[in-house]
From Swiss-Prot:
InterPro entries: eIF3h (IPR027524), eIF3h_C (IPR045810), JAMM/MPN+_dom (IPR000555), JAMM_MPN+_peptidase_M67A (IPR050242), MPN (IPR037518)
Localization: Cytoplasm
Domain MPN: 12-161
Any one GO molecular-function label of the UniProt entry: translation initiation factor activity
Record keyword Protease present: no
Keyword Cytoplasm: yes
Highest rank taxon of the organism: Eukaryota
PROSITE patterns (UniProt xref): MPN
Keyword entries, A-Z: Cytoplasm, Initiation factor, Protein biosynthesis
Name of protein: Eukaryotic translation initiation factor 3 subunit H
Subunit structure as annotated in this protein's UniProt entry: Component of the eukaryotic translation initiation factor 3 (eIF-3) complex.
Lineage: Eukaryota, Fungi, Dikarya, Ascomycota, Pezizomycotina
Amino acid sequence: MAEKEVTPLTAVKVEALVVMKIIKHCSQVFPTTATGSIVGMDVDGVLEITNTFPFPVVEVPPESHFDNAAPNPAAAAPRAKANTVYQAEMIRMLREVNVDANNVGWYTSANMGNFVNMNVIENQFFYQKEMNERTVALVHDPSRSAQGSLSLRAFRLSPKFMAAFKDNKFTSDELQKSNLKYQDILVELPVEIHNSHLITSFIHQLQNQTQATPAEIPTSLATLESSPFAKQTILAPNFDNLSLSIDPFLEKNCDLLLDSIETHHTETSNFQYYQRSLAREQAKITAWQAKRKAENATRATLKQPPLPEDEWQRLFKLPQEPSRLDSMLNSRQVEQYARQIDSFVSSTTGKMFAVKGNLLPSEIAK
């Protein structure tokens, strides 16, 4: 009997109650990181998330000094051993009350779209490798949601990145062989928010407007001019649109983008330093090998045994190439900031071009 072909995940369907729980938890602990577990089921490639619960955070006492303590316990909570036991116990209790008790991933909060980091990568790698391969990471950004639209996204690690991360192959040669780019780290899945039929019908009842009373026909011109509708015009000037104040969200994103670009420059400088060190050592090895060959040629004429030519491996030590993983994650984060700025910059740039003549009168004169 042939095995049933596995359908790849194509979308994520989240219950509205789960969304409200995630928003509440992330808003309560903002701006610190909030993490939790999500449960549900996989239905023909659509991951249906029906329940969630937060992870407890074990605070390290201030008087204790552990060298291996995580700098952010909440961010590392999904893969903590204590929380793994806690999650299994919670899922067992949910199963006893006939609730969907399949582990389908975890959720985390982000600030200004800053979620592409090692904690998120390690947590999702742990879930896809140890828990369940068909798991997702939900990322909720309270700062972005405060702008008026819900920011809830679902991500998975690509199979290509999973293989490279498992073997820790992030050198330049390995990345060229596997053709792994920073765009291949995360795979985003579309998110759909689902309501029950009862809630949907209730929302439609709330949206039902009151019946409008028939308008009275004005009897004279004076009555028409005194009407409150005559004093309101759609074409009235709105001077608020001329305000040149930049959105604080956009300003903060620009600052974070500059910080990420500076980090990228630092990573590039470190890699260039490695290349220079490698070139110096290789030049020393080449000079040593040439000298040893000349010595062996002289010894051959004197009918003496040759000296070993592989002794340079003991005398010289080539520098180890730094991992390119941090640089890849930072590049992916730069792309994330650039997309966010691109979505907010349209209204501001229009105002800047409108006042360009007053700011730079010399260009207008030319």
